[in-house]
Every structure is written in structure tokens, then in C-alpha cells.
């Protein structure tokens, strides 16, 4: 856009609109009809009507959402009003006199203003021209000066009965600070009392501007003005203004030949337009006040106006565009109990949406009219034909490009489906595309037609029955499938499908059946989760012939795989994904997803669990090239705000052309790229939030948030200013550093959001603008509401600077190559400072032949080949100075504090586990000993018969078992044997459980330790790479400094050799050229060396990580081997423990020991201590 010739002019108000027309305004609720005169102010800001008592009502044109005439306008329902308008008379022609104006803050909260004209067809002209004013791109994208002018127009229109401006209107217009309003009125010598009034003649535009300057002074603009005007002079000459425009307001990336800078004679036009002083205009001077209004003018719009018009190529295939899409369009609130309304289809289409959704269900008797509702919820119903009628009315009011109707068809009645098809044919008429275009047949490999080819057409997205004859519908839960089509429904004999096509469809059906069989193996919870994510979309029925015949270029098919889709190569097939499924595909196969969207279309919609109608962020799916990213238009949250803001561009057509890399099949695009994208120049964006104006109706502290939406590799940081120093919402100033987004990889996919918040995080206003639509320089940013409506008062004053991204390493070299003369002249000025650093300079300039002077003063050129040796030496020297970086070894990583601490904790856990196991083992043995003692005591009571004079003595457990003389020594009590077997079994189980616990705990420890080592290794390696990069940058800068010092040495030596000015200039140019080549060569060599070192470093780091991962398998194998060895010897250990513990109680099991009877000896049998065996078992475990 040229600075002096804005592309877009403000809307033109036709004379008859400003002159006015007589109407009758009626209200159905009150049954009142009032004669009014309807007008539009000459500047097109307000639609207003005046009653007979001179009372006036206003409607801001920016709030108008629709105008309707004839049968689409509201019709009185009150009998009283019907009698007033003689509606019962057949020759009344009432519909030719109607006019309805629809306005509201969003798409749900609407107000209808109804008028009836005295003449026929008057309402038609008013409806068309008023809507054209409301939808004009400059109505909501007007410059700051226009919004300030709207305030003046409204003040002058709201007059009291005496024809004067009430002062109280000023207080209502600027409610934030009444005292400041009074002071500003006083400064302009105007009345300031609450009950006073001002004569409109005393308040012209010049006085109004003075009032604004007093109410909202702009010290920040005064500072800018001071930095460019002549010292001690209160004005800026046209030369100074030209310099300011070319340096600050001009995009530095523009080519000076194709886009020449401003010239003083052109700038004089701006001074004539904005300078309030006539004397200054004659002298070509601009005052500070003129500077303020210049920065508020259309020449300094923050937007590139040409992007608001249709400026993109609209002849590409349909799948090469992002398409503004809606989900569950009929709902006005939540997904469970919200109201449904046909009006939502009008509002969504008027906002620029080109894809709407219709959830169709079978109507109930007796009418059996198909309905639209959200199935299995408490949402209300609307008739299908009402929705179709609304779409037919509003489809092409704001955009001529094709509309896609996305049917979610649950109507399993052939008769009702036929009725749906008939409604579409009759109401849409010629706009309904029923047959493919001749040049774009439905064949594999044939691309889709373009939006231009489909201009003014409506396309149906519905399941298509690919074969002739009806297909039986699938049963929904609790329903019964109906029979075949009735005879009244025609069936085509030839559907145009070849045998190859039928085979492909059969293959898809087989795959779908296999997937359904696999889904049958899922548990109930997984099936419920899948159904809740998809909502009712998975319950669609099969299309019958009538509806199927309407489907052509948008044929929904169940997604199978990217490979399958690529093999079939059918551009007319579209698949729908929930946000979760799309995110999964994007995460696992992002590049395949992008390639899929190059060939055919995809639709993404919110998951079924978003019962509050909230939205997901659409940016991630735009990054993958998904065309129809459907959102809930009734919820104006941040995702919807971004969608509304971006689709406002390209003429609000609902179609945005994707980037070339997302369209060309020979190019690969990875949305997760973090480095660079081939051939795409990254952008650096810097934004400084300077001040705000009229941000709130209350005196509060405010702050500003700045956020970037784009690729995952873009800078994702959200910046925020501090709170304004004082509670001042009229003109707060933030003196902070600029917010910099250093590397925006693909500017075409990025957008900037700037939001103003009140203290306490209350939303005040925001703006979302694509990066490619921004202009560099100082700009006033007019804010929008949450529903993207233009706000009259609030604005921000910002400074934007956009330039091509250049790494710091190449910054100096880029400047030198872009403007070598300017760069080296600047370096010459630094030579004096460097002279003391460089020390004594050599007498000879090069190592070859010295420069000499002839007797006549003519210079002699330096020896041949003097540049190359220096360049080579410097490059080698730079390469030698770069040391090869090292990475941490495996041993060093093992000694890291975090790893050692974790190992100690694991060792402690293992010791505790083994201690508990040993204690349990000991308890089992002691319990067995106690049970054995009890058995032997019982046996002793039956068999022992002590003598008369015998003395009672305490015996050990084994002594209590007395063997009778007739009883063999090798026979034992069977209960004792049973006790022994049970004890061995319990010990066996305890040992197995203990060994398994140890193995499981060791495996867990190995996993945790390896994960910890991997985490610390990655952190350390990231720090190593960062240090390496910082060191590399430092080395490069030092090398450049050395080369610069060397250049200065050569120039100093040259001046000593010859005094001829011409020769000096020539030799100086040679030295500078040589220096540039030398720097380029040295930087190239150093960069190659650094890249090699970085590759080696990354290879070592990768090898280290692989070693750590290999350790996990080794440790687990070792733990498993130990476990298997212990389990193998457990049985023998158990028997040995039992035998050793009770060896004297089971004499038959003692190895190589003679049988002995306790009866034969009076001595006690020896008993092993219990604790010693338990200790042995603990040490073994």
C-alpha cells in the first residue's frame, strides 16, 4: 500500500439515505406503530430515525448484522398491527413495503427493528444499501481519526429541544474522569455545568480536536516529534517529516525501486491535510498537534488495506483453501440443553462462514417433517425446511463463493429423506450443484474445482450410496431399520460407476467391517469413550437414492489410513476427525497429514464432551493444512476470536489460500519444524506498547498482553506489560522495552494478538491480525470486542518493526553487503578509537611488493595475489582457534548428584525389603516349632508313665516323644510329618514371593535410574550445546574484530606509502573489497568447522544416550538371571533349613547318624538356636 494513496476509501453514502424516507416503525410486543423518518448520517456512521415528537434513536452501523426485505422480513403477528397495515386485503402488497434491520453484539443476542414504507420496493433499496455500508471493509477497519469523528457526529446529532448539545452528553461519552472532562471543556472556553448546553456552532471540528487534546494529551507523540524536528523550533519541516516517514513508517524490506521512498513534495500533501495552522501549511511545517492527527489518519493504518479485499488467487482447487466452518450451527448455547434456532444459520453465513452443519433426525407423526437437533440431549428442535430456507436466503449475501452443507444424517426413513432432498432442490434451485462440472469429473487423480468455478453454488456433504438401488440404513440404538424405498422414489438404472469404482468401494467396506469387528473386542469403557468423543457422528445412517444423488464433490468416507488414501487418490473424498483423532494423526504423522490435505479435504470438529460448546485452538490444524476446521460459532472464546479475525481478510469470502508449501506435491512441509522452512524467509517482529486511549469507562489500572499464534517452532512466549502506574484509563503510558518475536518461521501462518486487560484480568478489548497484514511503524490500534465488533473509543498506540530474520552471526556481514559504503564509512569513524589498540603499524601493506609512488604522483598498484594468502591464512587461523567441544562421559553422568542420591535410596529400599523377608521367614520357622512342641506334648501325655519315686524334670520337645520298646525307631507321628510338609510349602511360597518382590523392585529401580540418567544427560547435553553456540558466536565476533583491526592496519599503512588522494581512494576500495571477501571466506570456514564440531558433539551425545539405554537391558537381564538362579535352588534351601532347624526331631532324615532313643539316655537332646537360622536366611536373601 502506498503511504500517500490508501487502497480503500471510506464507504459512500447515497444521497437518498442521508435525505431520509418516511416509514412506520412497529413493535410486535407492544403492538405500537409509530411514523418515523429513517436516515443515515452523511458519513455513514449511524442509522437513525426521528419520531414526530423529534425524539431520535440511533443504531451504530457497525452493529448491524443483517437487513431483510419482503418475505424474509419480520411480519406482524399482532392482530392490531395487521389491521393497521390492512394485511388481510389481498391487494395490499404488504411484503413489498417491509424492512427489517438486525443488530446485536454477537450472533445470539439479536434485536430486530421493523419498518414498513409508504411506497413499494423502497425497503428493498434501503436493505441493500444499508447492508453494503455495514459490510464495507472500512466500516470496521477505519482509521483512528474516523472513530474519533464518530463521537463528534453523535454529539452534534443528540441535541436538546433548543437545538443545543447538552453538557451531560459529554460526561456520558467520556465517563472515566468527569473532572478531566470539565477541565477540557473549560480549556476550550465552553460551558461545563451539568445542566448547561453548547451551541453546535461553537463546537466545530477544530474546537473538538482541541477538546480531545486537552482531555487526552499525547506526551509520547511529543517525544517522537522532538526527536525529528529542528532543535529549539516547535515545528517539523517537510524534510524532517519525509525522513521520519522513510525511516519509521516504511517497511525496511521493501525494494526502493519498486516502492520508492516518500519525497518532500509528496509529504507536503500530508501537511496540507493534517496541519491545523494555515501559516505552518504555507511554510511546509508540521506542528505537534498536526503530528498527532497525521498518526491517526488512514495513511498510517496498521493494516495493509489490500489484504481486506479479495486479493488471493481463487482459481486453485477447493482443497487448497482454509474454509470458514461451523459445528452444530443450529445451537445458540450449550450442547446438552441449549436452544436451537434457524436464525443461527443466517448469522453464521453472514459472518463469512462457508460450511455449516445440519444434524438431521426423523420427524414424528403426523407431519413426519424432518427436524434438526442435537440427538440424545435436551436441546430444542427446529424444522429442517426452516433451516434450508434460512440458508437459501443468506448463503451469498456477504460472499459469492460456494457454501458446503455438512449433513449428519440420522433420518432412517426413505420418505423423509426424499422430502429433505425435495426441500433442497426447490429452495436452492439453480444454486444447488447436483451434477459434477464437465471439466472436473469424479475420477481418481482429477483435482477439485476452484471456488471461482463453484461461485454461487451450494454443495452437499452427505453419505453417498455408490450403487444403484437403495441401501438399507444402519440401525441406531433402540431403532429398527426401515424397508426398501417406496415405489414413489425413483431409482436410476445407471449411476455412472465403473467396475473399478465398485471394487474400490467394496474394498473400503471390507476394511470398515474389519475395523467394526476389531472395535467389538474393545471393552465397554473404551467404546463409551470413543462414542463420547465422536458425539452422534458415528451413528449416521446410510443415504437413500434421493439424498445420495445430491452429493458430488464432498463425499464423506471413513478414514482408513494415509497410505490407503494416497493409493486411491480421490480428491472428492473427505474424512471428518474429532479434535482428539486429528491431534493424534498430527502428532504421529504430521507430514503425511499435510500431504493428505494437499490432495483432498478434511474436516475437524470439537469432541463430544465439550458440553459447554467451548472450542479448541484451530491453529494446530491449520498448520497441517486441514481445510474445514469447524468451531462452535455461538461461543466467542479465544479460538473463535482467532477464527473470526483471520477470515475477515480476503474480502470476508470465507476462503483463505494456503501457503504454496501446503499445496505443492513436490514440496515437503513439516509443521513441527524448529529450524527453518526451505525458501521461506523467517520474520522478526518487534512491538512496543507505548500508550492507550479511552480504554475503559472507569478509572482503573490496565495492562496489555501480546501473544503470537503460529507454528510450534515459532516463539511461543506471551508477553505482558506492567500495570499502568496510576488508575488512568484515558491516556495510560507504558515505558517498557519492546517485545521481540525473533524468528517467525512462516509468517503466512502466524498472527498477533494484542489484548488490553483491567486490573483483575477483566477483558477490555483486543485485536488479532495476521503477521503478513501488519505495517511497520507507529500506529493506532483500534480494539475489538470479544465478538470481533469494532469498539469506538478504546485504542492502543504501538510501534511495530518487522524485518527478515538474520542470525546474530551474520548480522554485521549482512549490513556490510547490503550497503558497503555506508558500513565502511561508519567503520572508518571508529578507526581513531582502534588506533591505540592496534599499536605500531607495519610499513608494508602486504607480504608482497610494497606500494610505491612515481615522481608525478601516480599510484602504483600493489603486488599481484596479495589478497588470497591473507584470506587463506585468516581462515586457517580461525579454524585452529576453535577447540573441539567435549561431552560428559558415562562415568561422569553416573557420579552426578541426582543419580547417586537415587541409587542410595534404592539400596535402602532393597535392604528394607530383604529385612522384612527374613523376619517373615523366621516367624514361619518359630510358628512351626511351636506347633511341633504342642504335638509332642500331646503325645507325651498318652505314652509317658513315670515311676512312683521318679522325679519330675523339664524336657526338650524331642524328649517328650518316648519310643516304646515295641515301636520301631524310624516311625514318626504322621501329624508331625504333615506339619513338616506344610512348613516346607509355606517357606517355599514365602521364598518365591520374596524373590519376585526383589526382582520387581530391582526392575523398577533400573527403570528409574536409567530415566534419571537420561533426564540429567539431556539437560547436561543441552547446556553443552548452548555453551558451544555461545562460544561459537563469541569466537566469530572476535575473529571479525581481528579482521577489522587488520583492515585498519592496511589502510593506515597505505596512507603512509602514498599521499595521492585518487590513489588512496582506489586502494582503499581495494582493501575494503578484499576485506569483505576475507570476512566471507573466514566466516565460511569457521562456520563449516563449527558445524563439524557440533555434529561430532551431537554424535557423541547420541552415543552416550544409546549407552545409557543399553544399560537398562543389561541390568534387567542381570537381575533376571539372579532371580532364576535363586528360584532354582530355593527348594533345596527350604529342605535344608527345615532339616537343620528340626534335625533331632526327625532322626530318620539325619544323614549318616545312628538312630538313638531319648529313652536310652538320661541326657537332654541338643537343640539348635532359632535366631541363628533366621539370621542365616536373612543374609542369604
Swiss-Prot record:
Name assigned to this protein: 1-phosphatidylinositol 4,5-bisphosphate phosphodiesterase beta-2
Domain of life where this protein originates: Eukaryota
Residue numbers spanned by region Disordered: 465-534, 847-890, 1149-1181
Protein source organism: Mus musculus
Domain named PI-PLC Y-box: residues: 547-663
Designated gene of the protein: Plcb2
Oligomeric form and interacting partners: Interacts with RAC1. Forms a complex composed of at least WDR26, a G-beta:gamma unit, and PLCB2.
Reaction(s) catalysed by this chain's protein: a 1,2-diacyl-sn-glycero-3-phospho-(1D-myo-inositol-4,5-bisphosphate) + H2O = 1D-myo-inositol 1,4,5-trisphosphate + a 1,2-diacyl-sn-glycerol + H(+); a 1,2-diacyl-sn-glycero-3-phospho-(1D-myo-inositol) + H2O = 1D-myo-inositol 1-phosphate + a 1,2-diacyl-sn-glycerol + H(+)
Recorded coiled-coil stretches: 893-940, 974-1026, 1075-1141
Lineage: Eukaryota, Metazoa, Chordata, Craniata, Vertebrata
Amino acid at each position: 500500500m502506498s503511504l500517500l494513496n490508501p487502497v480503500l476509501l471510506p464507504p459512500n453514502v447515497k444521497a437518498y439515505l442521508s435525505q431520509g424516507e418516511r416509514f412506520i416503525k412497529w413493535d410486535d410486543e407492544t403492538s405500537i406503530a409509530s411514523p418515523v423518518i429513517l436516515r443515515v448520517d452523511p458519513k455513514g456512521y449511524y442509522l437513525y430515525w426521528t419520531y414526530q415528537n423529534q425524539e431520535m434513536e440511533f443504531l451504530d452501523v457497525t452493529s448491524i448484522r443483517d437487513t431483510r426485505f419482503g418475505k424474509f422480513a419480520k411480519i406482524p403477528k399482532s392482530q392490531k398491527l395487521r389491521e393497521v397495515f390492512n394485511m388481510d386485503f389481498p391487494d395490499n402488497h404488504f411484503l413489498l413495503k417491509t424492512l427489517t434491520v438486525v443488530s446485536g453484539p454477537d450472533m445470539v443476542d439479536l434485536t430486530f427493528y421493523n419498518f414498513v414504507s409508504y411506497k413499494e420496493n423502497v425497503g428493498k433499496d434501503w436493505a441493500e444499501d444499508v447492508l453494503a455500508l455495514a459490510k464495507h471493509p472500512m466500516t470496521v477497519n477505519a482509521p483512528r481519526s474516523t472513530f474519533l469523528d464518530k463521537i463528534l457526529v453523535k454529539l452534534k446529532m443528540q441535541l436538546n429541544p433548543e437545538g443545543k448539545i447538552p453538557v451531560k452528553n459529554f460526561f456520558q461519552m467520556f465517563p472515566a474522569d468527569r473532572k478531566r472532562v470539565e477541565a477540557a471543556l473549560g480549556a476550550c472556553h465552553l460551558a461545563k455545568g451539568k445542566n448547561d448546553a453548547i451551541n453546535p456552532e461553537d463546537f466545530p471540528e477544530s474546537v473538538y480536536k482541541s477538546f480531545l487534546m486537552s482531555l487526552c494529551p499525547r506526551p509520547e507523540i511529543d517525544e517522537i516529534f522532538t526527536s525529528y524536528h529542528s532543535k529549539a523550533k516547535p515545528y517539523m519541516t517537510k524534510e524532517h517529516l519525509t525522513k521520519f516517514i522513510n525511516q519509521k513508517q516504511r517497511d525496511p524490506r521493501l525494494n526502493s525501486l519498486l516502492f520508492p521512498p516518500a519525497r518532500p513534495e509528496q509529504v507536503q500533501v500530508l501537511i496540507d491535510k493534517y496541519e491545523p495552522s494555515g501559516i505552518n501549511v504555507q511554510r511546509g511545517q508540521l506542528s505537534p498537534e498536526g503530528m498527532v492527527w497525521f498518526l491517526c489518519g488512514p495513511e498510517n493504518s496498521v493494516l495493509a488495506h489490500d489484504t481486506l479485499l479479495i486479493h488471493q488467487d481463487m482459481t486453485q482447487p477447493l482443497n487448497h483453501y482454509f474454509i470458514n466452518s461451523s459445528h452444530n450451527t443450529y445451537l445458540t448455547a450449550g450442547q446438552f440443553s441449549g436452544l436451537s434456532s434457524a436464525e443461527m444459520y443466517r448469522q453464521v453465513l453472514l459472518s463469512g462462514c462457508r460450511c455449516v452443519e445440519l444434524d438431521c433426525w426423523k420427524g414424528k407423526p403426523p407431519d413426519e417433517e424432518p427436524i434438526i437437533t442435537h440427538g440424545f440431549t435436551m436441546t430444542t428442535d427446529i424444522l429442517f425446511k426452516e433451516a434450508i430456507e434460512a440458508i437459501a436466503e443468506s448463503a451469498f449475501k456477504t460472499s459469492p463463493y460456494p457454501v458446503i452443507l455438512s449433513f449428519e444424517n440420522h433420518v432412517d426413513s426413505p420418505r423423509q429423506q426424499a422430502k429433505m432432498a425435495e426441500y433442497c432442490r426447490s429452495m436452492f434451485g439453480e444454486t444447488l450443484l447436483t451434477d459434477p462440472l464437465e471439466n472436473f469429473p469424479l475420477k481418481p487423480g482429477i483435482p477439485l474445482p476452484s471456488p471461482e468455478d463453484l461461485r454461487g453454488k451450494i454443495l452437499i456433504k452427505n453419505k453417498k450410496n455408490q450403487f444403484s438401488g437403495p441401501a438399507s440404513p444402519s440401525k441406531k440404538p433402540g431403532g429398527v431399520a426401515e424397508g426398501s424405498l417406496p415405489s414413489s422414489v425413483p431409482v436410476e438404472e445407471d449411476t455412472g460407476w465403473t467396475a473399478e469404482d465398485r471394487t474400490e468401494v467394496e474394498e473400503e467396506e471390507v476394511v470398515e467391517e474389519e475395523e467394526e469387528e476389531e472395535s467389538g473386542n474393545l471393552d465397554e469403557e473404551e467404546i463409551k469413550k470413543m462414542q463420547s468423543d465422536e458425539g452422534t457422528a458415528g451413528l449416521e445412517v446410510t443415504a437413500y437414492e434421493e439424498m445420495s444423488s445430491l452429493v458430488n464433490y464432498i463425499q464423506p468416507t471413513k478414514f482408513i489410513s494415509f497410505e490407503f488414501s494416497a493409493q486411491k487418490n480421490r480428491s472428492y473424498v473427505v474424512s471428518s476427525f474429532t479434535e482428539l483423532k486429528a491431534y493424534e494423526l498430527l502428532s504421529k504423522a504430521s507430514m503425511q497429514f499435510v500431504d493428505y490435505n494437499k490432495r483432498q479435504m478434511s474436516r475437524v470438529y470439537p469432541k463430544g464432551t465439550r458440553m459447554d460448546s467451548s472450542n479448541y485452538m484451530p491453529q494446530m490444524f491449520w498448520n497441517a493444512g486441514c481445510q474445514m476446521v469447524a468451531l462452535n460459532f455461538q461461543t466467542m472464546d479465544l479460538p473463535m476470536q482467532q477464527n473470526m479475525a483471520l477470515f475477515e481478510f480476503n474480502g470476508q469470502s470465507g476462503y483463505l489460500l494456503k501457503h504454496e508449501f501446503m499445496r505443492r506435491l513436490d514440496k515437503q512441509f513439516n509443521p513441527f519444524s524448529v529450524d527453518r522452512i526451505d525458501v521461506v524467509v523467517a520474520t522478526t517482529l518487534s512491538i512496543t506498547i507505548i500508550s492507550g486511549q479511552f480504554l475503559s469507562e472507569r478509572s482503573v489500572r490496565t495492562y496489555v498482553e501480546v501473544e503470537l499464534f503460529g507454528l510450534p517452532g515459532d516463539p511461543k512466549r506471551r508477553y505482558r506489560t506492567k500495570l499502568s502506574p496510576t488508575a488512568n484509563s484515558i491516556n495510560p503510558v507504558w515505558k517498557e522495552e519492546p517485545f521481540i518475536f525473533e524468528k517467525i518461521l512462516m509468517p503466512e501462518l502466524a498472527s498477533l494478538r494484542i489484548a488490553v486487560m483491567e486490573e483483575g484480568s477483566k477483558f477490555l478489548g483486543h485485536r488479532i491480525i495476521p503477521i503478513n497484514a501488519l505495517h511497520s511503524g507507529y500506529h493506532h490500534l483500534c480494539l475489538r470486542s470479544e465478538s470481533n465488533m469494532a469498539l469506538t473509543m478504546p485504542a492502543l498506540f504501538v510501534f511495530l518493526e518487522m524485518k527478515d530474520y538474520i542470525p546474530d552471526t551474520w548480522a554485521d556481514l549482512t549490513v556490510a553487503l547490503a550497503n558497503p559504503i555506508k558500513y565502511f564509512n561508519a567503520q572508518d569513524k571508529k578507526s581513531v578509537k582502534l588506533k591505540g589498540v592496534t599499536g605500531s603499524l607495519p610499513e608494508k601493506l602486504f607480504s608482497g611488493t610494497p606500494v610505491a609512488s612515481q615522481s608525478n604522483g601516480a599510484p602504483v598498484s600493489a603486488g599481484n595475489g596479495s589478497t588470497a594468502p591473507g584470506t587463506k591464512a585468516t581462515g586457517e587461523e580461525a579454524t585452529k582457534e576453535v577447540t573441539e567441544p567435549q561431552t560428559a562421559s558415562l562415568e561422569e553422568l553416573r557420579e552426578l548428584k541426582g543419580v547417586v542420591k537415587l541409587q542410595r535410596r534404592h539400596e535402602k529400599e532393597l535392604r528394607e525389603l530383604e529385612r522384612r523377608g527374613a523376619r517373615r521367614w523366621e516367624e514361619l520357622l518359630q510358628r512351626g516349632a511351636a506347633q511341633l512342641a504342642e504335638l509332642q506334648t500331646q503325645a507325651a501325655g498318652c505314652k509317658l508313665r513315670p515311676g512312683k519315686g521318679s522325679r519330675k524334670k523339664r524336657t526338650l520337645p524331642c524328649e517328650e516323644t518316648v519310643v516304646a520298646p515295641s515301636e520301631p525307631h524310624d516311625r514318626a507321628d504322621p501329624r508331625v510329618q504333615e506339619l513338616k510338609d506344610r512348613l516346607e510349602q509355606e517357606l517355599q511360597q514365602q521364598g518365591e514371593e520374596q524373590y519376585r518382590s526383589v526382582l520387581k523392585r530391582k526392575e523398577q529401580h533400573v527403570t528409574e535410574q536409567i530415566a534419571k540418567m537420561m533426564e540429567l544427560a539431556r539437560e547436561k547435553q543441552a547446556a553443552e550445546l548452548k555453551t558451544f553456540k555461545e562460544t561459537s558466536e563469541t569466537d566469530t565476533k572476535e575473529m571479525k574484530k581481528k579482521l577489522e583491526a587488520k583492515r585498519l592496519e592496511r589502510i593506515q599503512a597505505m596512507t603512509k606509502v602514498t599521499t595521492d588522494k585518487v590513489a588512496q581512494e582506489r586502494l582503499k576500495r581495494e582493501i575494503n573489497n578484499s576485506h569483505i571477501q576475507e570476512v566471507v571466506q573466514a566466516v565460511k570456514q569457521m562456520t563449516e568447522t563449527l558445524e563439524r564440531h557440533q555434529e561430532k558433539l551431537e554424535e557423541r551425545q547420541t552415543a552416550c544416550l544409546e549407552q545409557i539405554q543399553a544399560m537398562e537391558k543389561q541390568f534387567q537381564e542381570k537381575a533376571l538371571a539372579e532371580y532364576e538362579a535363586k528360584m532354582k535352588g530355593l527348594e533345596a534351601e527350604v529342605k535344608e533349613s527345615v532339616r537343620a532347624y528340626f534335625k533331632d526331631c526327625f532322626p530318620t532324615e539325619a544323614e549318616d547318624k545312628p538312630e538313638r532313643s531319648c529313652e536310652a539316655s538320661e541326657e537332654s537332646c541338643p537343640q539348635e538356636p532359632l535366631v541363628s537360622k533366621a539370621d542365616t536366611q536373612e543374609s542369604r536373601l
